[in-house]
Amino acid sequence: MNKIDFIEMEQMKKNIPVFRPGDTVKVHVKIVEGDKSRIQVFQGVVIGRQNGGIRESFTVRKISNGIGVERSFPLHSPSVDAIEVITRGQVRRAKLYYLRKLRGKASRIKEKKYVAGM
């Protein structure tokens, strides 16, 4: 392992939940306004993950007042306070960019079923 990899491993967050495209997540983001800071929650569907390691980022899409809003977050950024997985989605693609064209009920994602006790 070289020095760059060692420095990157030190800066990576350890408490990141496992999530994939299609999952509905809540992202708690720190927002600094002047000398005050607050946490804002952005809830939506993960439509893609990009890169890997310290540079990894993910894109979340939600519908707000009938308008689609997408926001990209660096996974290991200090401004991302927490990530909560709300539901697991069952999809067959790594990038869900086709959701941008769909409206209403057509943009729903099938939920994964889990069998308890196995």
UniProtKB/Swiss-Prot annotation:
Which molecular function terms from Gene Ontology are attached? structural constituent of ribosome
Task: Supply the source organism for this entry.
Answer: Geotalea uraniireducens (strain Rf4)
Note whether Magnesium occurs among the keywords. no
Q: Which GO terms describe its biological process?
A: translation
**Coiled coil regions, renumbered to chain:** none
Transmembrane segments annotated in the record for this chain: none
Keywords, A to Z, come to:
Ribonucleoprotein, Ribosomal protein
**Can you name a GO cellular component term?**
cytosolic large ribosomal subunit
According to its UniProt entry, the function of this protein is described as: This protein is located at the 30S-50S ribosomal subunit interface and may play a role in the structure and function of the aminoacyl-tRNA binding site.
Protein known as: Large ribosomal subunit protein bL19
